[in-house]
A protein has these predicted regions:
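Sec-dependent signal peptide hydrophobic core
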Residues: 5-12
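Bacterial Sec-type N-terminal signal peptides, specifically the leucine/valine-rich hydrophobic h-region
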Residues: 14-17
């Protein structure tokens, strides 16, 4: 049976806006499935995963790929791989590639994202960082951004951790969450993922699902 393989292009501006100010749009899997079935019946031209990753712009693009396996649901047999060199992530369901998406991991200094095999230990729709964020006043307006919780707060202000939606903790303080994607490793160790892709991961993975960083 043939499936339509979808590619969604996410612009830099949209990623920055969605990761910080708006809630990601929910994915309607039934609608997605119907669209894929209809496209298959119409014999539309599909792009295979192999051709997607063979593209010369694969390493630098913000495109992501979705396959027919995305309609399946089996958290016990689902896992995600984070590819540090290529700054890409891949979701597997029942041993089949379901989605490939861009990520931004930790910088290659004291904030690197450690390699290894881990398990998701916590999931939260909305999570606030306990380390990084902004100082805000009594009205909640930002006084100073991009600060560490240990920094001295200006008079009358307090620390407010950065919002990290679709949070999935897998290695101590490190987790996967929505965030700005610049196609380079630039986080404090976490794995930043575009909102739409991250919401899908949140739905398809569970506590105990495997995360492989390599």
């Amino acid at each position: 049976m043939k499936f339509l393989l979808q590619i969604v292009t996410v612009s830099a501006g949209m990623v920055a806006l969605c990761s910080c100010q708006t809630s990601p749009k929910a994915v309607d899997y039934y609608q997605l499935g119907n669209e894929m079935e209809e496209a298959a019946k119409n014999k539309r031209v599909s792009r295979t995963f192999e051709s997607f990753i063979a593209s010369p712009t694969y390493r630098t693009s913000r495109d992501f790929w979705r396959g027919g396996a995305l309609r399946e649901y089996n958290p016990a047999e689902s896992h995600v791989e984070i590819l540090l060199e290529m700054q890409r992530g891949r979701l597997y369901i029942n041993g089949k590639i379901a989605m490939d998406f861009p990520v931004s991991t930790g910088t290659k200094d004291q904030h690197d994202t450690p390699c290894g095999t881990f398990r998701i230990t916590e999931k939260k729709r909305e999570h606030h960082s306990s380390l990084y964020g902004s100082f805000v006043d009594a009205q909640g307006d930002v006084v100073k951004s991009k600060v560490h919780s240990s920094d001295k707060a200006p008079a009358g202000s307090r620390f407010q951790g950065t919002l990290m939606e679709y949070w999935m903790r897998f290695n101590g303080a490190i987790g996967m969450h929505t965030g700005k994607i610049e196609r380079e490793a630039e986080s404090h160790g976490c794995v930043r993922i575009p909102p739409e892709a991250c919401s899908i991961l949140f739905d398809k993975l569970a506590i105990g699902s495997k995360v492989i960083v390599k």
